[in-house]
Structures are given as C-alpha cells and as structure tokens.
Amino acid sequence: DVAPSRGLGDVYKRQTFRTIPLKYRIDVAMSGRLGMEIQPKNMTEEEKTLCKNAIAEYKTIRPVVQLGDIYRLMSPYDKLGVASMMYVTPEKDKSVFYWWKTEHFVNQHLPRVKMAGLSPDKLYKVHELNRIDNDPLSFEGKTFSGTYLMANGLEIPYNHKVDYHKQNDYSSRVLWLEEVK
C-alpha cells in the first residue's frame, strides 16, 4: 500500500482554537486514504449526507489517488494563501486536483494554480466533487485542453457561495478531470 493516510477528525482544532468546516476536512482527507474518525450520532442529517456523498465520490477517484503520480503544485509553507496538489494516472486520462485556501485576508488576491502532469494533447472535462455551493462553478462540465490547464489553470473562487449562516473563512475544492474521447 503506497497511498498516504489522511483522516477526518474533530471539528474543533485545538492548536488554532478554530472551527474547521466538514467540507474542508473532507477535501483534505480525500487527498489520501479517506478516513473518518467522527461520531455519526453527533452529526446533522446534512453532515451525514455530505459524508455519504464524499465516500461515494472517493470510490471513483481512489485508484487515481492511491496509484497515480502526485504533483505538488503550491506549498502551504510558501504563505501565498493557497495549497494545491493533484494526482494523475500514468495514462494521463484521469486526474484529481485539490485546492485549499490556507490564509484568511480581507480583499485578498489568491494566485491562479497551474496544473501539471496532464497530456498537452488531450481534452479534459471538469467536475467538482463535494460541492456545497448553491450554484456550480463557472467551469463545471466544461472541457479544456491539457495545454490550457497546465499553462493557465482555472480561476478558483476564494469562497463558497452558500447561504449566509454557512459562510466561513475556509474554502476548498476537489476537481475530477476526465479525458474526453
């Protein structure tokens, strides 16, 4: 077994005294072997549904995460406000792209993350996993060339477009890219 282990734990982070949303924790855990160390009896129905959907979606991407080539795109240690990585199959026909907002500023401008490891000649359809936004991303279901994605990346929104009572400082995205044949 070669995949990194990542688990989904408590909502409250003792080191930072902050509450980290379930979506963000799921997206981090999905970048390894998705594990959940939480009590279902303490979860709302909405949280249970989000976890069930994440498990189902993870089953689709698991071979790519566990056996694909890893590309570390932006390090959280660079303090640019974003961390990002992706996995790509050896055939370059499927990929999982991860994006996490790591810093919290007012009127911030986050860098656009260029992807890596894709085939320049292939076309890829983009689908967001674990979506919580009221509306899909502007590029949901659209097709882009590997050349474009590696030269430009995609414009990732800094925040989730959710109802007011669900807004918070954390934002994360998981994108599934699949070759269009």
For each feature predicted by the language model, list its residue ranges.
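Short acidic (Asp/Glu) and glycine-rich catalytic loops that position anionic groups and cofactors
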Residues: 9-10, 28-39
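Carbohydrate-binding surface patches
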Residues: 77-120
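Conserved, mostly hydrophobic/aromatic
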Residues: 29, 97, 126
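N-terminal leader/propeptide and maturation segments of large enzyme subunits in energy/redox metabolism
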Residues: 36, 41-49
